[in-house]
Amino acid sequence: MDGDIRKNSLDDGSMDALTGEQSIRNFNINFGPQHPAAHGLLRMVLELDGEIVERADPHIGLLHRGTEKLMESRTYLQNLPYLDRLDYVAPMNQEHAWCLAIERLTGTVIPRRASLIRVLYSEIGRILNHLMGVTTGAMDVGALTPPLWGFEAREELMIFYERACGARLHAAYFRPGGVHQDLPPDLLDDIEEWCERFPKLVDDLDTLLTENRIFKQRLVDIGIVTEADALDWGYTGVMVRGSGLAWDLRRSQPYECYDEFDFQIPVGRNGDCYDRYLCRMAEMRESCKIMQQAVQKLRAEPAGDVLARGKLTPPRRAEMKRDMESLIHHFKLYTEGFKVPAGEVYAAVEGPKGEFGVYLVADGTNKPWRAKLRAPGFAHLQSIDWMSRGHMLADVPAIIATLDIVFGEVDR
């Protein structure tokens, strides 16, 4: 009929009015939270132009438990297990920062033996983390053998955790004033024997991955971060060292007795995913050397207390059985908790993923007034849009893997 305005039934609003052709639009997809390469509860809305990433919008908070608020209503000692549940891949490294913050506010000096045990188990945590990061990252780009090898070594390290404190994962082993208990007699021998075998595993992973043509094609020149960019985004750990900046708190701001240990700081040149992979491989070798040195120093150290006895720590069991004052102190410590002098402090450790810090504000009571947790993964994840823009969709899992994020600490 004359005058009819005939509409194309297939037109969904994307038809060009002048030419009648279908205009090409970007489309959005959801990456995660149920995705094997998301490394936790990561949901990203990806805007794609074909297979090119135009925008990556990370949605966080799916694992938010309100940790910082919960810490304000519990005693300092009751708060310690919360730290294990942040970066649950290497739990003791987070406990370390919490204990350092309390010790600095109270002016506590811990026994040397406890300090050496802390260094030993912090490096075990670093290897636990890097084995997980490197091998699952390799799996994300198609190499299925490394996780099978890496998790075998991780299992042995988790048994060392269990033999020291009774727990494989949520240890609560580091305590304000030292560590909960001394190591069993044969444990140092077994750790030393493991350290002699471990470089062979790293060599095998090296042979399998480092010069593998497909592996290099997936990582080289992907997710490049310059030194200036790393500083602008607030990167720490491997993310900043992979870009050429030799910043490591164990060397630049030594804590515990790290200044007594001989180790190198692996540094990359190109700031891409491949350099970050190489840094983690080299760091595992250096951590193994630190563990061997710690074992030798612990052997040379006379057997003694691993807790600085005082207001922060319980009395010895033998004293409690014969002294009423000690028994009362023990009861008060585990019911009311110890008081921390009013003040504020920032204590940071070089965690496996970067600088993990605790900003603690004390008001003189037995509970913190405020505890701010500085999670390295949070700073790294904020740049995922900037890092992945212009890359292929298949490059996104490789970038996420070398960011090394875990959602226990990102969401807190």
From Swiss-Prot:
Alphabetical list of Gene3D superfamilies matching this protein: Cytochrome-c3 Hydrogenase, chain B
Keywords: Cell inner membrane, Cell membrane, Membrane, NAD, Quinone, Translocase, Transport, Ubiquinone
A Pfam family annotated for this UniProt entry: Complex1_49kDa
GO cellular component: plasma membrane
EC number(s) given by UniProt: 7.1.1.-
Keyword Translocase: yes
Annotated compartments: Cell inner membrane
GO molecular function, one term: NADH:ubiquinone reductase (non-electrogenic) activity
Reactions accelerated catalytically: a quinone + NADH + 5 H(+)(in) = a quinol + NAD(+) + 4 H(+)(out)
UniProt xrefs under InterPro entries: NADH_Q_OxRdtase_suD, NADH_UbQ_OxRdtase_49kDa_CS, NDH1_su_D/H, NiFe-Hase_large
Topology class, membrane: Peripheral membrane protein
Domain of life: Bacteria
Biological role: NDH-1 shuttles electrons from NADH, via FMN and iron-sulfur (Fe-S) centers, to quinones in the respiratory chain. The immediate electron acceptor for the enzyme in this species is believed to be ubiquinone. Couples the redox reaction to proton translocation (for every two electrons transferred, four hydrogen ions are translocated across the cytoplasmic membrane), and thus conserves the redox energy in a proton gradient.
Family: Belongs to the complex I 49 kDa subunit family.
Subunit structure: NDH-1 is composed of at least 14 different subunits, Nqo1 to Nqo14. The complex has a L-shaped structure, with the hydrophobic arm (subunits Nqo7, Nqo8, Nqo10 to Nqo14) embedded in the inner membrane and the hydrophilic peripheral arm (subunits Nqo1 to Nqo6, Nqo9) protruding into the bacterial cytoplasm. The hydrophilic domain contains all the redox centers.
Protein name: NADH-quinone oxidoreductase subunit 4
Source species: Paracoccus denitrificans
Gene: nqo4
